[in-house]
């Protein structure tokens, strides 16, 4: 408890000093200029065992750029302007060095697309700043490793797994065969699926680790049916975040069953096929800017910047502490083109949001599913609810 209180006091003192300096905002006669830092580093994925379509190298960055354009479009009427200082590095050490340089220039608002370890280093290095996590789905970042100055615009694995489990429950596909890869991310995704199975009454009839090191492009039709032999199941769930083998499970299972998880029917924060509630206009504007489809990291960066801009519009300043306080209140509903107002949970900083369930070229459904009720918000049926949260930094620093 003493450890959490010390973290909270350090955070509050740092933000108070930042409020006195507030060098990231230039209040001039002609308006307010808000500078936002974008920090990105992604470790090498290593050799893949399939020819999976790679993630765009500018994933996330283009979403932040579009949000700056959108914010300036509305901000000019209020004499507010927004500028993005983007940093993409090849090493985590360079990321911290470049972030320090932006911090020395007075920037106190950051959108970060980086793994959990680097996010924690940045959050601890800049306690007077407000960071938005737009790149890591780590459940630990929303739990015991949370930080009071770190909000999360990207859904975590628990939210994704719950969204999928709710849909499977509505279809009464409650017997799962779980196939898990060997990476730490795969194991974390599998752990989230185990948690969701317990929450929504599913049974994992068998869990099979994928330990093969061969390319499945030529042998999937022969090997996958034998590998997926097991007790009767309704659906095959796959935890393969890198894409080593999961793409070859659909249509190759022992029983003719659907595949879901990281491949097949996939829960995600955003997808090209999301078009309702004005989303089609956002998709078109993004494609005109980036020349490609908008993905979940692009949307996470976009909504993070829009969160800042929406708060600045209400506050008429860009103080990091004030933005955090407003974001965690009920007074900053955000329009994310998902059919519901989005908001940040005040117990762990996670953005509440509906989760699309998609396959590569179509939207299948959106969770939370009808009938999954909650006393406060149905969106809180996805992920860690207040009673089960292990995050203590927000209680100390709120």
Predicted ranges, named:
Residues 7-20:
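Bacterial N-terminal signal peptides
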Residues 3-8, 23-398:
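Extracytosolic ligand-binding ectodomains
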């Amino acid at each position: 408890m003493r450890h959490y209180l010390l973290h909270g006091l350090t955070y509050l003192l740092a933000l108070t000093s930042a409020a006195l300096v507030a060098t990231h905002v230039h209040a001039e006669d002609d308006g307010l200029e808000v500078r936002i830092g974008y920090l990105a580093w992604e470790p090498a994925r290593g050799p893949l065992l399939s020819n999976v379509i790679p993630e765009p190298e500018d994933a996330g960055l283009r979403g932040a750029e579009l949000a700056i354009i959108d914010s300036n479009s509305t901000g000019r009427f209020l004499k507010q302007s927004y500028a993005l200082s983007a940093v993409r590095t090849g090493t985590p050490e360079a990321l911290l060095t470049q972030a320090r340089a932006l911090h020395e220039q007075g920037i106190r608002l950051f959108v970060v697309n980086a793994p959990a370890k680097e996010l924690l280093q940045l959050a601890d290095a800049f306690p007077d700043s407000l960071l938005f996590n737009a790149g890591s789905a780590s459940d630990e970042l929303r739990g015991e490793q949370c930080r009071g100055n770190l909000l999360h615009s990207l859904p975590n694995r628990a939210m994704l797994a719950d969204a999928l489990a709710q849909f499977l429950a509505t279809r009464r596909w409650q017997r799962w065969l779980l196939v898990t890869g060997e990476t730490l991310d795969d194991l974390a995704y599998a752990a989230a699926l185990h948690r969701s199975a317990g929450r929504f009454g599913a049974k994992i009839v068998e869990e099979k680790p994928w330990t093969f090191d061969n390319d499945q492009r030529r042998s999937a039709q022969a090997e996958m049916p034998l590998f997926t032999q097991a007790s009767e199941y309704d659906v095959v769930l796959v935890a393969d975040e890198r894409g080593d083998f999961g793409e070859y499970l659909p249509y190759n299972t022992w029983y003719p069953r659907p595949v879901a998880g990281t491949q097949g029917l996939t829960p995600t924060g955003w997808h090209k096929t999301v078009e309702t509630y004005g989303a089609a206009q956002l998709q078109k504007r993004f494609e005109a800017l980036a020349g490609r489809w908008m993905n979940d990291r692009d949307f996470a960066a976009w909504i993070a910047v829009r969160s800042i801009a929406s708060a600045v519009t209400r506050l008429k300043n860009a103080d990091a502490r004030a933005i955090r306080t407003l974001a965690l209140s009920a007074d900053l509903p955000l329009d994310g083109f998902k059919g519901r107002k989005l908001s940040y949970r005040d117990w762990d900083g996670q953005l509440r949001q509906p989760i699309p369930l998609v396959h590569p070229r179509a939207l299948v459904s959106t969770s939370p599913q009808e009938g999954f009720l909650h006393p406060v918000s149905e969106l809180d049926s996805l992920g860690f609810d207040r009673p089960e949260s292990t995050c203590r930094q927000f209680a100390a620093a709120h």
